[in-house]
Amino acid sequence: MKKVIHIGLPELSEEELIRVGEIGQKIIINYIFDHLAKSEVRDLEVTARINRGETLDLELEVYVEVPIFVKVDVESLIEEALDKAYEAIEDYLRRISNERGEKAQRTSEEP
């Protein structure tokens, strides 16, 4: 399952772009393993793609394989993990935006 959001912040450094992907991957992996034991997961793949254009697009793709005897709605679990990841990324981007806004405001206030 994958989900794409249009972030709309084209002015991120390479380091910030990498951090966005890392945040998404970390949140998803932690969320999956908060709900499943490691022994219940046969395969887990999390892919983050960032495309720069007029806007910044982030695509997170998650694949989870569990044995048939594990009673879990994998699609719902993935959807919840993706939602948590996008919330965390949104918080990170807001912090960056606020920091830049404060920096710009301080610069414009200086004589």
Curated annotation (Swiss-Prot):
Q: Tell me, what's a Pfam family for it? A: DUF3194
User: Which InterPro entries does the record match to this protein?
Assistant: DUF3194, MTH677-like_sf
Q: Which family does it belong to?
A: Belongs to the UPF0440 family.
- This protein's name: Uncharacterized protein PF0383
